[in-house]
């Protein structure tokens, strides 16, 4: 068939091999949430308050209740939430923070922005940081002050294992939950094992804003109050700045849309992600594309990652794309290999598992508006690409 015929939804066109499937579809989302989102915008516009008002306050309370934590503090990005969490925990200049090399660079960047130094430890086959290797690293180097684990792809790490690291080695644990909204393990949500946790509200996330944003979580009321000061220039009262803070405020419009249009749908979004992930996993099991699944617990399925165990990703990815399937790579360049950290930080060993996954991982489309026919098209394209 020559050319392609588009409908009104981005990423769904009839092409040479059938449906074209995009990684996300914000046009479909807008059709779903439009009425509630516009009502939220109208409410904010009529309130006369655009920054740090009742919408942010209400969203913080409602999200904390949904997530299962005591306190939530809305900020401008997930990166800022991580940095603020580190600063609230007293992690700064001269401190070492042990983290994963296989994740978005924001995790390492938050450590750098706090003035600390990253130490990267290898991951296991699920992509999550290997807690046994973390413990070995802490035993070998008692100067490490903090651990920043990432619940990568939405796969929950062991909360009891994280708590054990803190109690046995005296380190601060700050969890990166940017990808794990809705993940649970041992009947606990991610973000409850450390002194603080951070999530991202970037549009592609499980709970994504219509712009950017982030949230810091904590069970510690004093830490949460310090975070509220730090997000607003370190201001404790008008024109009184007790510490050097950031300009990092979640705005009223984003908070209103999140609490009115998106948070009420989040359980439905997560259920659909689980359905899609289960279908992919069943179809691909034992084949040349190994689903990279959680070790235990319920993944949030922010991504559906696979490891190419037969063939080469550089050959299979173009075949998938030719079949109309959007293919992601998460994350092809490890954090310690980025130019921004040249001469900075320390890797514990050669990081063989992280390097293997970085070179052989692909991400298949997964989002709550993906239709059954599109899921089938992805599966069929995977079979054809690997034939």
Across the structure, where does each feature detected by a protein language model lie?
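N-terminal "arm"/small-domain region of PLP-dependent enzymes with the aminotransferase-like
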Residues: 1-49, 54, 365
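PLP-dependent aminotransferase class I/II
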Residues: 12, 56-61, 69-70, 132, ...
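Phosphate-binding glycine-rich loop
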Residues: 49-96, 110-114, 120, 188
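Conserved PLP-anchoring active-site segment centered on the Schiff-base-forming lysine
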Residues: 83-141, 146-148, 320
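Helix C-cap/helix->beta junction micro-motif
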Residues: 114, 168-169, 323
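Active-site phosphate-binding strand-loop segment of PLP-dependent enzymes
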Residues: 126-209, 217
């Amino acid at each position: 068939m020559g050319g392609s015929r588009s409908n009104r939804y981005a990423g769904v066109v009839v092409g040479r091999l059938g449906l074209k499937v995009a990684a996300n579809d914000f046009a479909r989302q807008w059709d779903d949430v439009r009425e509630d989102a516009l009502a939220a915008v109208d409410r904010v516009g009529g309130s006369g308050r655009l920054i740090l008002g009742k919408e942010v306050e209400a969203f913080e309370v409602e999200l904390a209740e949904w997530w299962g934590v005591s306190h939530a503090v809305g900020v401008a990005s997930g990166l800022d939430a991580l940095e603020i969490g580190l600063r609230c925990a007293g992690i700064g200049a001269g401190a070492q923070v042990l983290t994963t090399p296989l994740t978005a660079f924001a995790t390492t960047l938050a450590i750098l922005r706090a003035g600390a130094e990253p130490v990267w430890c290898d991951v296991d086959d699920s992509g999550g940081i290997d807690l046994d290797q973390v413990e070995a690293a802490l035993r070998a180097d008692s100067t490490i002050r903090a651990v920043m684990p990432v619940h990568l792809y939405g796969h929950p790490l062991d909360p009891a294992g994280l708590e054990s690291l803190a109690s046995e080695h005296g380190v601060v644990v700050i969890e990166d939950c940017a990808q794990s909204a809705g993940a649970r393990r041992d009947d606990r949500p991610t973000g409850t094992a450390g002194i603080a946790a951070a999530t991202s509200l970037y549009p592609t996330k499980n709970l994504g804003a219509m712009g950017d944003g982030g949230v810091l979580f904590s069970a510690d009321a004093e830490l949460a109050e310090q975070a509220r000061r730090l997000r607003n220039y370190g201001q404790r009262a008008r024109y009184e700045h007790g510490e050097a803070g950031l300009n990092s405020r979640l705005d009223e419009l984003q908070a209103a849309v999140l609490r009115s249009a998106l948070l009420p749908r989040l359980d439905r979004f997560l259920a659909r992600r689980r359905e899609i992930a289960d279908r992919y996993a069943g179809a691909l099991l034992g084949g040349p594309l190994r689903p990279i699944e959680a070790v235990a617990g319920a993944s949030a399925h922010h991504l559906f990652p696979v490891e190419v165990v037969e063939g080469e990703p550089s050959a299979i990815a173009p075949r998938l794309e030719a079949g109309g399937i959007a293919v992601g790579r998460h994350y092809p360049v490890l954090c310690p290999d980025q130019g921004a950290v040249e001469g900075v930080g320390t890797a514990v060993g050669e990081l063989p598992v992280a390097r293997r996954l970085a070179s052989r991982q692909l991400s298949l489309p997964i989002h709550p508006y993906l239709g059954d026919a599109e899921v089938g098209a992805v599966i069929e394209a995977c079979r054809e690409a690997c034939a």
